[in-house]
Amino acid sequence: MEKICYTAFVAAFLIGGQALAADVQKLPQPDLTQPLPALMELLNARQSVRSFNKDKPIDEQTLSEILWTAFGVNKHGKRTIATARNEQNMKVFVLREDGIWFYNAADNQLEKISEENAIPFTAEKQAFVNNAPLHLIYTSSDMHLGHNHAGSAYQNVYLYATAKGLATVIRGLVNFEELHRALKLNKDEFVIVHQPIGYAE
């Protein structure tokens, strides 16, 4: 009887461990030495694009670099954007068809928080959004400065997207209530803005 119980315990532990592992996606390290266009060229070429190729996904290396650009940890141990009083209290979530993921910058990984496909909550009356393979949601608990921090992050992503031939746009026409629920935000946290990313159609 004891052997049966022990075997069942081990099996449950292993299954639980596999489930936990499946909920974490380790990201490749960003390539910080790749040659990219000069900053002034990127600023000059930056634009918002509202047409996405739904059949062309974003690879893991590019995903990692997008997230690092938005709110990663730099060589000083700080973030890639400045935050007032070094609060660093912004959160970045990734929405994909396979669920909702939280970007853990310190461990350079995505952590799944839900199997739900929340992309429809970002589309509202703009159907083109559904074609983007990657969606970033910026959230914060700072009503006064959170929008500033998100603006710095999505501008970084704009410039990276321009350098890599990606399409992106900033949007505020989303279902804030449903996203708040789906992202499992605390009462003092709120959704700031949505940034779909992909390749232009």
Question: What are these model-derived regions, one by one?
Answer:
Residues 1-7:
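Positively charged n-region of N-terminal signal peptides that target proteins for export
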Residues 7-17:
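Bacterial N-terminal signal peptides
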Residues 22-132:
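N-terminal amphipathic, basic helical "cap/leader" segment at the start of enzyme domains
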Residues 46, 66, 92, 134-136, ...:
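Small-aliphatic-rich amphipathic alpha-helix that forms the alpha element of a beta-alpha
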Residues 52, 138, 195-199:
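Short beta-strand element of the conserved SAM-dependent methyltransferase core
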Residues 72-74, 99-100, 142-144, 176, ...:
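Solvent-exposed loop/turn segments at secondary-structure junctions
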Residues 184-201:
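A glycine-rich helix N-cap at a beta->alpha junction
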